[in-house]
């Protein structure tokens, strides 16, 4: 059965001032899959990820050509509201970034911005989001304690719950486990595998093991170019490009 495309990147190039950081990228992200972006530092993988919900717009020197099509529209169209876009395409960062509020208020933050005041609804969203983020059992008795008192791995899962509360379609993750200990990282990986049943996920990772464990497709990037994009098994066991093989085998990176 053919997979449903959720988002398509077409001829995307990005410049920081005159420096080209992405060079004519073409790729498609598919529904209910995890796509891993791999490559050495500075290859453009985080820049590509941030392009998908227009986080690069916040950098004054950036210019972008090409298109990213989502729900039949180019997200770079002037008609697209970036606030609405980022509700549908949420992002989890490398360092957990909970707000200095209670766990409960972190999760409902986006709903409160939308004017939701129904306590029963907020309670339900908090429980469902924390369960989906694989952390409910750890925090259900301390919901009104500060999220800053949690471990790094717990904070990262609360940040995931905060995104889930506004019901996104796509979740972007920029090295979400690199600042975590191995046990915490494994819990976040478990969470991602559960979440892909309901969401589409794109992750930047420096860990070949992580990419091979959790992703359905892998894109290898080098010097702003998309070198190879295929199902993860093919990328790791039978890469078509020599650069991909060299990177995966540790010859550079």
Swiss-Prot record:
It is a peripheral membrane protein. Disulfide bonds: none annotated. Keywords: ATP-binding, Cell membrane, Membrane, Nucleotide-binding, Phosphate transport, Translocase, Transport. GO terms for cellular component: plasma membrane. It is an enzyme of class 7 (translocase). One of its GO terms (biological process) is phosphate ion transmembrane transport. It catalyses: phosphate(out) + ATP + H2O = ADP + 2 phosphate(in) + H(+). ATP binds at residues 39-46. Residues 7-248 form the ABC transporter domain. The keyword Transferase does not apply. GO terms for molecular function: ATP binding; ATP hydrolysis activity; ATPase-coupled phosphate ion transmembrane transporter activity. It is found in: Cell membrane. InterPro entries: AAA+_ATPase (IPR003593), ABC_transporter-like_ATP-bd (IPR003439), ABC_transporter-like_CS (IPR017871), P-loop_NTPase (IPR027417), PstB-like (IPR005670). Its EC number is 7.3.2.1. Part of the ABC transporter complex PstSACB involved in phosphate import. Responsible for energy coupling to the transport system. Belongs to the ABC transporter superfamily. Phosphate importer (TC 3.A.1.7) family. The complex is composed of two ATP-binding proteins (PstB), two transmembrane proteins (PstC and PstA) and a solute-binding protein (PstS). PANTHER family: ABC TRANSPORTER I FAMILY MEMBER 17. This is Phosphate import ATP-binding protein PstB 1. It comes from Lactococcus lactis subsp. lactis (strain IL1403). The gene is pstB1.
């Amino acid at each position: 059965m053919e997979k449903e495309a959720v988002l398509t990147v077409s001829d995307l190039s990005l410049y920081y001032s005159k420096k080209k950081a992405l060079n004519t990228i073409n790729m498609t992200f598919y529904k209910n899959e995890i796509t891993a972006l791999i490559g050495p530092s500075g290859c453009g993988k985080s820049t590509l990820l941030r392009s998908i919900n227009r986080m690069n717009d916040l950098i004054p020197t950036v210019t972008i050509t090409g298109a990213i099509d989502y729900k039949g529209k180019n997200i770079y169209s002037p008609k697209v509201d970036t606030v609405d876009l980022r509700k549908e395409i949420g992002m989890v960062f490398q360092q957990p970034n909970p707000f200095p509020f209670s766990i409960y208020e972190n999760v409902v933050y986006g709903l409160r911005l939308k004017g939701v005041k129904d306590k029963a609804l907020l309670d339900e969203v908090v429980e469902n989001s924390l369960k989906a983020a694989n952390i409910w059992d750890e925090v259900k008795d301390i919901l009104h304690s500060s999220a800053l008192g949690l471990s790094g791995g717990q904070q990262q899962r609360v940040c995931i719950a905060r995104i889930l509360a506004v019901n996104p379609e796509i979740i972007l993750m920029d090295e979400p486990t690199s600042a975590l200990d191995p046990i915490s990282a494994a819990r976040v990986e478990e969470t991602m595998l559960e979440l892909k049943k309901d969401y589409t996920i794109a992750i930047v990772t420096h860990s070949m093991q992580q990419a091979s464990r959790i992703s359905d497709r892998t894109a290898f990037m080098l010097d702003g170019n998309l070198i190879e994009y295929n199902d993860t098994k093919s990328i790791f066991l039978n890469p078509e490009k020599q650069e991909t093989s060299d990177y995966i085998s540790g010859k550079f990176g």
